């Protein structure tokens, strides 16, 4: 990743890069399971976006969950610039976050399990950074369009916040909101650590377990 760009505040409207009207080329199929990266996905498949630092390691966390995960992809969301490049996102002038798109079957992969994986795989108290990766594109974020799923996400945040406070951590800084447009990242980023097993992964959790199941219920149950 690009360590030398470390913008730690969101850009002002007059700083936003213009982007482009056409999507960037990306991979057509998932490198691990061979499924098409882009929708439309099969009936019953839901999607959520997770930002937890560098998306290379974050994506691997989710595809490794196995059954119930239809496909994963990395991209940019929660910003302003249309169809940004990776280099543009790293300037901090697009407003985007590096995120993982997870398309999953809630009958086989409860949303709770995705939430637990999300919270336990990073430190959600660090603001505009994850470890050595500093910048607005590394902020903790959870993006779902469905209001019920958003309520589940907020309940899980509150439960995990209590667990973190008990261990001496500060408040959670995760943003939970509607995703807005999702832009697929360039092909070389997709399933990066499957193609490059020794590649960089800056992901690291707090070691605090997320008490999913306390006031957080899966709608499919």
From Swiss-Prot:
Reaction catalysed by this enzyme: L-methionyl-[protein] + [thioredoxin]-disulfide + H2O = L-methionyl-(S)-S-oxide-[protein] + [thioredoxin]-dithiol; [thioredoxin]-disulfide + L-methionine + H2O = L-methionine (S)-S-oxide + [thioredoxin]-dithiol
Record InterPro entries: Met_Sox_Rdtase_MsrA_dom, Met_Sox_Rdtase_MsrA_sf, MsrA_MetSO_reductase
EC number: 1.8.4.11
Pfam family, one: PMSR
Signal peptide region: none
Keywords: Oxidoreductase
Active site residues according to the UniProt entry: 54
Alphabetized GO MF terms: L-methionine-(S)-S-oxide reductase activity; peptide-methionine (S)-S-oxide reductase activity
Gene Ontology annotations for the cellular component aspect, listed alphabetically: cytoplasm
GO biological process terms, semicolon-separated: cellular response to oxidative stress; protein modification process
Family statement drawn from the similarity comment of this UniProt entry: Belongs to the MsrA Met sulfoxide reductase family.
Function: Has an important function as a repair enzyme for proteins that have been inactivated by oxidation. Catalyzes the reversible oxidation-reduction of methionine sulfoxide in proteins to methionine.
Stored PANTHER family: MITOCHONDRIAL PEPTIDE METHIONINE SULFOXIDE REDUCTASE
Protein name: Peptide methionine sulfoxide reductase MsrA
Source organism per UniProt: Methylobacterium nodulans (strain LMG 21967 / CNCM I-2342 / ORS 2060)
Gene name, Swiss-Prot/TrEMBL: msrA
